[in-house]
Swiss-Prot record:
This is Homoserine kinase. InterPro entries: GHMP_kinase_C_dom (IPR013750), GHMP_kinase_C_sf (IPR036554), GHMP_kinase_N_dom (IPR006204), GHMP_knse_ATP-bd_CS (IPR006203), Homoserine_kinase (IPR000870), Ribosomal_Su5_D2-typ_SF (IPR020568), Ribsml_uS5_D2-typ_fold_subgr (IPR014721). The lineage of its organism: Bacteria, Pseudomonadati, Campylobacterota, Epsilonproteobacteria, Campylobacterales. It comes from Helicobacter hepaticus (strain ATCC 51449 / 3B1). It catalyses: L-homoserine + ATP = O-phospho-L-homoserine + ADP + H(+). Belongs to the GHMP kinase family. Homoserine kinase subfamily. The keyword Ligase does not apply. ATP binds at residues 84-94.
């Protein structure tokens, strides 16, 4: 059995902990019943012994099986990681979603994405990456605690069309979300809060109605982006050059260090070429959007 989960880009500027989308860059997780337990990792992180010794996927997978009183047994795990680790592209969300979906398939339990989403929230308490990893497309997510004893995720998904594409710039610097959040203030002014609220609403409307001309102005942010970009000052130039060369939107991806640029498909090759020329030490990749999310690709 093989599960595929896409990379994700969250925040998208003003949508802090709320907005996210899925990209066609996937981690695959193979799970096979076996006489002996084993783990093999290829791709990103394959040279990190910690990923084998203390593997988060296996930990969550086993916890979900135990939650449903499923008898424990040995498995052969084989993971291929295409999503860069600690680069703001949802590698941790892919692991969480993949582990839960994988456990459901092993138990032959019907895939209830709403139920899986709530389980995933117990491992990552902000849903902006979790929802697109699970559902695909563009997602608006919120946490609601008004009627429940614990917070519930509510999300709305919109499919992304094929006339736009992502050009992602990936610096050779890892930044953890926990570290990145330390640079953020505890309080914001009413003026900045209204600014972000209005821009996040307009950005959501632009994605849902496909009014791409609004992306540039609607993706401005006053909560987190510039503060986080100061950790890697070159990102200010990435954004400037991208917007001067066809990008409709240019924002920090999640907490960084990657930068998400969205452009028309006809402009993606030129934009990628220019960015790679200016930033030869960074990876620059063109990606389509993923509208499927986590899926079983081999039973």
């Amino acid at each position: 059995m093989v599960i595929s989960v896409p990379a994700t880009s969250a925040n998208l500027g003003p949508g802090f902990d709320t907005l996210g989308l899925a990209l066609k860059l996937h981690n695959t997780f193979s799970i096979t019943p076996s006489k002996l337990s084993s783990i093999h990792i290829s791709g990103e992180g394959e040279d990190r012994p910690k990923l084998r010794i203390d593997n988060v996927f296996i930990k969550i997978f086993n916890e979900i099986l135990a939650l449903h009183n499923y008898p424990m047994q040995p498995f052969k795990f084989s993971f291929h990681n295409a999503i860069p680790i600690s680069r703001g592209l949802g590698s941790s969300s892919a692991v969480i979603v993949g582990a839960i979906v994988g456990a459901y398939h092993i138990m032959q339990k019907p895939i209830n994405k709403s139920e899986i989403l709530q389980l995933a929230l117990s491992y990552e308490n902000h849903p902006d990456n979790i929802t697109p990893a699970l559902y695909g497309g563009f997602n608006v997510s919120m946490l609601d605690s008004s009627l429940k004893t614990k917070e519930q995720v509510i999300n709305v998904q919109a499919l992304l069309p094929t006339d736009i594409k992502a050009v992602v710039v990936i610096p050779n610097v890892a930044i953890s979300t926990k570290f990145s959040r330390r640079s953020l203030p505890k309080k914001y002014s009413t003026k900045d809060a209204v600014f972000n609220l209005s821009h996040a609403c307009m950005l959501s409307a632009a994605f849902i109605t496909h009014k791409w001309e609004l992306l540039r102005v609607a993706s401005q942010d006053r909560f987190h982006q510039e503060l986080r970009m100061k950790n890697i000052p070159a990102l200010f130039n990435v954004q400037k050059i991208a917007l001067e060369n066809g990008a409709l939107l240019s924002t920090l991806s999640g907490s960084g260090s990657s930068f998400l640029n969205i452009c028309y498909c006809d402009d993606s090759g030129n934009l990628a070429h220019i960015l790679q020329k200016h930033f030869p030490k960074f990876r620059v990749i063109e990606l389509e959007f993923d509208n499927i999310g986590a899926t079983l690709i081999e039973s």
